[in-house]
Amino acid sequence: MTRAESNIVLFSITLCWASSYLFVKNLPPDLSPFAYMTMTSGLAFIILAIVFFARLRDLKGRVLWRSAILAAIVCFNLVFERLGVSRIPASTASFVASLTIVFVPLFLLLLKQRPTKNNVLGIPFILAGLVLTSGVQRGAPLELGVLYMVAACIFMAIYVIVVDGFTKNDDPLLLGIGQMLWVAVIAYLLWLVEEPRTFFALTYTNEMLASIFLLAFFARAYAYIMLMYGQRYANPISVTVIASTEPVVTMVLALLIPDTFGQTESFTFAKLVGGVLIVIGAICAGTDFLDNADLLNRLRLGGKGEKGVAAS
C-alpha cells in the first residue's frame, strides 16, 4: 500500500466516524454504554467472522493477547465517547474528539519521538480551524460531556500509538477481529454486572436496531480493520492529522441532513473559515516539504533566479 492509498483509506475511516455521531444521537439516551459496546462490537465480530472465517484459526497466541490489550483501551474510549456524545451537541463532540491531534504528539514526545517540521507547522492551523468550526467560545461553561470526550480523546491517542507498534509486526486483520471479540466480551461482562437481564432489559425499536447495525458495520467492522491496515503504512501523527478533518466532514453532513442533527446545527462564515484552516493544516502536516532539502533548494534557487532577472 502506497502512502497515497493509505491516506485515502484513513480518510474513509474519518468519514465513517464523523457520520457515526449521527447514528449515536439516534440511540436511546438511557442506553447503557456497555450495552452499546456489546451490541456494536459483537455484531462487528460476527460480520468479520463470517467474511474471514478461514482466518479465524490463526487468531491465537501473541495476536490474541495483543488484541486484548487494544480492546481494553478501546473499551475506555467507547465508554467515555458514548457518555460524552449523549450530553453535548455533535459539533462540540467532534471538536473535542479531534484534539487527538494534540495528545498524540505529546505522548510521542514522552517516548522521545519528535514530530516533523510539517507537523509543527500544520497543527496550529488545525487547532484554529477546530475552534472556529466547533463554535466553542471563550468563557463558556465546561460541561461534563466535554470532560468525557477529553477522556475518550486521550485513550484514542494511546490506542493510535499502540496500534502503530502492533501492526508493524502482526497481521492487522487478525488484530482487528480479535479486538472486536474482546471488546464484546469485556463490555458484556460489565453490562451483566450493571443489568443482569442484559438484552431482555432493552426496548427495541427499528430506529435503534438500524443505528446499531450501521455503527457495527461502518464505525466498527470497517473502520477499525482499515485503521489497522492504514497504520501499517503510516505514522501515528499522519493518522491523527487525517482524523482531524472529521469536523469538516461532520459539518458537511449537517448541511446534507439537517433534520437529523437538529435545528441548532447551522452553517456560518466562521465554520467555513475553520474548515479551510483545517484543510490547510492537514495538507501542511500530512506532507514533508519542509524536510525535503531538494525542494527547498530548488525554491531558493528559483527565488534567486527571479531576482537576477528583475535586476538585469
Where are the model-predicted features located?
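Specific transmembrane alpha-helical segments of multi-pass solute transporters/efflux pumps
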Residues: 20-21, 52-97, 130-133, 216-234
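Transmembrane alpha-helices of multi-pass small-molecule transport proteins
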Residues: 16, 28-76, 103-107, 125, ...
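Helix-helix packing/entry segments at the starts of transmembrane helices
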Residues: 36-39, 79, 93-99, 163-185, ...
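Juxtamembrane helix-loop-helix junctions in multi-pass membrane proteins
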Residues: 15-44, 83, 89-92, 158-183, ...
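C-terminal-most transmembrane helix of multi-pass membrane proteins
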Residues: 8, 39-42, 208, 244-312
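Glycine-/small-residue-enriched transmembrane alpha-helix faces in small-molecule transporters
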Residues: 1-35, 72, 80, 139-165, ...
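C-terminal transmembrane-helix exit sites in multi-pass transporters
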Residues: 47-56, 100-121, 248-272
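Hydrophobic transmembrane alpha-helices of multi-pass small-molecule transport proteins
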Residues: 48, 115-135, 187, 255, ...
